[in-house]
A protein has these predicted regions:
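N-terminal Rossmann-like dinucleotide/flavin-binding domain of flavoprotein oxidoreductases
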Residues: 2-6, 45-136, 140, 216-242, ...
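FAD-site-proximal beta/loop scaffold in flavoenzymes
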Residues: 160-176, 263-345, 349-353
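Core beta-strand elements of the Rossmann-like FAD/NAD(P) dinucleotide-binding domain
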Residues: 6-8, 132-142, 259-268, 307
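Rossmann-like dinucleotide-binding cores of NAD(P)H-dependent redox enzymes
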Residues: 91-98, 172, 177-181, 187-248, ...
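Beta1/beta-strand and adjacent pyrophosphate-binding region of the FAD-binding site
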Residues: 2-16, 176-186
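Glycine-rich dinucleotide-binding loop and its adjacent helix/turn
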Residues: 50, 147-202, 235, 285-307
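A Rossmann-like FAD-binding core segment of flavoenzymes
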Residues: 75-76, 111-114, 118-130, 199-299, ...
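Flexible, glycine-rich terminal cap/loop adjacent to redox cofactors
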Residues: 11-39, 51, 55, 59-62, ...
Length: 479
C-alpha cells in the first residue's frame, strides 16, 4: 500500500452534478481543483435517480396523454414494449459507466481521484483508493462537501431478509415485478408507482399519511390519487407496515404485515420513506461536527460552526432543497464565492446578489412526473398562511384554457397562484395537469423576479397554449 500527497487550491468531495459544477466554477476562477468520487462520476441523478426514472416514466405519461387525443386512442391502447423501455433507460443511464463524465471533467482541467475521501482535519482530506493506496490531499483555500443523500429505511422487523428496493433498485430493475408494494406517498413513491404500473406491474401503495404528496397543495395529491386508482393502483392511506418476511429465498414473495393485522403479498417492495445525508463516513468528527448530520450553511454555503471559513457544503447534503437543479444553482454560487474569496475580492451579500443564495428560500421549482404532472414553485397556501403574510389564493380550472383542448378529451387540471397583497407580487404557483411541467419556468421567473402584477399583465401568452392560464389567473384575481 502506497501513500502520496498532493496540494490543490480546492478539494471537492463528491462528483455528482453538484460537485462537478462547483469544480468547474472554481477552476474557471483559475484555482487548481480536484474531485474525489467513490462511485460513479455523475452521481445519483445520472445513474439512479433523475435520468433513469424519467426514462421509465416518459413512455407511460406519453401513452396516457395520447390516449385522450381523438384518433390516437386505439393506436396507443396496447401494452408498452417493456424491453425497449428498459433498453432506453439503460442508454439514458450510460449503461452505468462514467467515461463521458470523466472526459468532461478532464476537458475543464479538473483532476479526478477515485476513492473514498474523508476529512482528517482543517483543509485535509485522505482518500482510500480502490487499489488500497492512500492519497493525502491539502487544500490551500477550500474543501467542498457535495456527497448528497441516501435512502433511509424504517426499522421494520424482517427488513434485512426482505431485501427491499430503495429508489436505486426501483430505477434500475431489469424486469417488471408482477406485484409491487410501494411504502410511502412522496415524490419517489408516486413516480415509481406510475412507472411500474404503466409497465405492467400490479401496484399497491401503503401510505402512512392520509394523502399523497402531502407537502404540496392538496389538489395535487388528490388528482394523482384519482389517476393512479383509475389505472388500477391499490392505494391504502393511514397504513403502517409492522413486519416483513421474504419466503422461499431470493426470488420468493414478500409477506407484508400491516398495522391492522392484515397481510399482503408482493414480489418486490419499495421503501420510499425519506432521505438522509451522506455524511456518516466523511470525517466530520475531525473538524468538530457530528457524523451523519445535515451540514448547516450560510447563504454562501460556508458550513457554520467550523473555524476559518474553509469548509463548504453544497447540494442535498445541506438540506436546503433536495433537488439536482437547486444543487447546481448552489454550486454556481459556491464556486463563485470560493473563487472571489481566494482572490481577496469583496463578497456581494445583498439578496439576489451574485454571491448569496436567495432562490433556495423563495423560488424552488419542482416537477413531479406523474399522470397528471405536478409543477410548483415558491410557497404553498399552507406555508403562506404559516408565514403570516397577507395572501390571496387564486384558483383556475386548467381545463377551461384553450390550450388544454389540444391535449384531447377529458383534460383534468388546476392552477393556483398565491399573491402577496402587500407587495402585489406572486409568491407561489402550483399547476396540476398534463403538460404543466413546461409551465414551471415561467412561474419561477415570476416568483424569483418578484414581477409586479401590473407588469405581469403585459406578458402576453401565446394562443392556444397552456400558458394562457397566466392571463386567466390574473383576470380571476381582478374579478
Amino acid at each position: 500500500m502506497n501513500e502520496t500527497t498532493r496540494t490543490y487550491d480546492v478539494i471537492v468531495i463528491g462528483g455528482g452534478p453538484v460537485g462537478e459544477n462547483v469544480a468547474e466554477r472554481v477552476r474557471a476562477a483559475g484555482l487548481s481543483t480536484v474531485v474525489v468520487e467513490r462511485e460513479l462520476l455523475g452521481g445519483e441523478c445520472s445513474f439512479w435517480a433523475c435520468d433513469p426514472s424519467k426514462a421509465l416514466l416518459r413512455p407511460v405519461v406519453a401513452r396516457a396523454d395520447a390516449s385522450r387525443v381523438p384518433g390516437l386512442d386505439p393506436a396507443v391502447a396496447g401494452p408498452l414494449d417493456v424491453e425497449r423501455v428498459l433498453a432506453h433507460r439503460d442508454r439514458m443511464s450510460s449503461y452505468w459507466k462514467d467515461e463521458d463524465q470523466a472526459e468532461w471533467l478532464n476537458s475543464v482541467s479538473v483532476d479526478l481521484i477515485r476513492g473514498h475521501g474523508r476529512l482528517t482535519g482543517p483543509k485535509q482530506v485522505a482518500v482510500q483508493t480502490p487499489e488500497g493506496d492512500t492519497v493525502v490531499l491539502t487544500a490551500r483555500h477550500a474543501v467542498a462537501v457535495s456527497t448528497g443523500t441516501r435512502a433511509t429505511l424504517p426499522p421494520i422487523p424482517g427488513l434485512d431478509t426482505a431485501r427491499p428496493w430503495t429508489s436505486r433498485e426501483a430505477t434500475t430493475a431489469d424486469k417488471v415485478p408482477g406485484r409491487l408494494a410501494v411504502v410511502g406517498g412522496g415524490v419517489v413513491a408516486v413516480e415509481m408507482a406510475t412507472a411500474w404500473q404503466g409497465l405492467g406491474s400490479q401496484v399497491t401503495m401503503l401510505v402512512l399519511d392520509n394523502g399523497l404528496l402531502e407537502r404540496m397543495e392538496p389538489f395535487a395529491g388528490e388528482l394523482v390519487t384519482d389517476t393512479l386508482r383509475e389505472a388500477g393502483v391499490d392505494i391504502r392511506f393511514n397504513t403502517t407496515v409492522t413486519s416483513l418476511d421474504r419466503e422461499g429465498g431470493q426470488d420468493g414473495e414478500v409477506r407484508i404485515t400491516l398495522s391492522d393485522g392484515g397481510q399482503l403479498a408482493a414480489d418486490e417492495i419499495l421503501l420510499a420513506t425519506g432521505r438522509a445525508p451522506q455524511t456518516r463516513d466523511v470525517g466530520l468528527e475531525s473538524v468538530g461536527l457530528t457524523p451523519g448530520d445535515w451540514l448547516a450553511v450560510d447563504d454562501t454555503f460556508q458550513v457554520t460552526g467550523v473555524d476559518g471559513g474553509w469548509l463548504y457544503a453544497v447540494g442535498d447534503v445541506n438540506h436546503r432543497a433536495l433537488m439536482t437543479h437547486q444543487g447546481k444553482y448552489q454550486a454556481r454560487i459556491a464556486g463563485t464565492v470560493i473563487g472571489a474569496r481566494a482572490k481577496g475580492e469583496p463578497i456581494h451579500d445583498a439578496p439576489w446578489g451574485a454571491h448569496v443564495a436567495t432562490a433556495d428560500h423563495a423560488a424552488v421549482p419542482q416537477v413531479v412526473f406523474t399522470t397528471p404532472e405536478i409543477a410548483s414553485v415558491g410557497l404553498t397556501s399552507r406555508e403562506a398562511e404559516q408565514s403570516g403574510r397577507r395572501i390571496e389564493v387564486v384558483d383556475y380550472d386548467l381545463a377551461r384554457v384553450a390550450g388544454a383542448h389540444q391535449y384531447g378529451e377529458d383534460y383534468r387540471g388546476r392552477a393556483r397562484m398565491l399573491i402577496d397583497t402587500d407587495r402585489n407580487t406572486v409568491v407561489g404557483v402550483t399547476f396540476a395537469g398534463p403538460g404543466v411541467g413546461e409551465l414551471v419556468h415561467s412561474a419561477t421567473i415570476a416568483v424569483a423576479g418578484e414581477v409586479p402584477l401590473d407588469r405581469l399583465w403585459h406578458a402576453v401568452p401565446a394562443f392556444p397554449t397552456l400558458g394562457e392560464v397566466w392571463l386567466r389567473l390574473l383576470e380571476t384575481y381582478r374579478g
